[in-house]
């Protein structure tokens, strides 16, 4: 049976998804205009899988979020497709820039044990791995 977790207005145009226990962590794009730009970018937030209740992880709009992975320490590594940013979002919502690239940083893979980011550069038609060890001391 299908389960609707939340109404469209609270979802902020979900893009990246990650299940953690009884929660769905959502990387939101923000409400797109006709050209996919946004007046208000999306947040990173958590939806309770039982109640559908939404809890913001980032208190401010974070970006046009795409890729989402756990950092293995209670936080997240996320990509902003439009801005070309790779961000770290700590468990408390603090956000910092890890890497800056050209537009097109899409879904990603992050391997916490080796601190390796595997990132598609969609508009450049390439995939590259990055060592983030220095970013997670």
Report each predicted region and the residues it spans.
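Beta-rich, blade/repeat-based domains predominating
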Residues: 8-31, 38-41, 59-75, 102-115, ...
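Structural signature of WD-repeat beta-propellers
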Residues: 80-81, 90, 121-122
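Flexible "stalk/tail and boundary" regions
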Residues: 21, 87-93, 112
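A short loop-to-beta-strand structural motif that recurs across blades of beta-propeller domains
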Residues: 43-45, 85-87, 126-128
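A short beta-strand motif characteristic of beta-propeller blades
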Residues: 2-9, 52-59, 93-99
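Lipid deacylating catalytic domains
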Residues: 46-47, 58
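Short loop/turn segments that connect beta-strands within beta-propeller blades
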Residues: 1, 48-52, 89-94, 132-135
